[in-house]
């Protein structure tokens, strides 16, 4: 087990206090907001002829990367594609009914995973040395990376 420094302990305590405060004071989503996110949400089949700014993409990434993963392993890797040239490289991997949708999208997110995610566990899960659990265990790495990036 890794011993946390005083600064790390303070950071953990501050993060926990911040979460508890947020949880205790957060507004409950109303029905329309819940329906927008979950109940009525569908795959999009068309787009506005409008650019998606790099700032918007960064904001989406910053939110997405905080999603929960087992042991904070965070194996997902994101590539955001805006250029027509890069989208063309995706074309042969797409199902025929998705080609027009992807080619006309202002930005495409490609999500993959890093099988060497355990190289970052000292930073992502600092309170316990779990990297050895993953080292040399390709079946566990594959399963963990897949489940925690999709």
What label would you give each PLM region?
Residues 1-150:
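Acidic, surface-exposed loops and disordered segments
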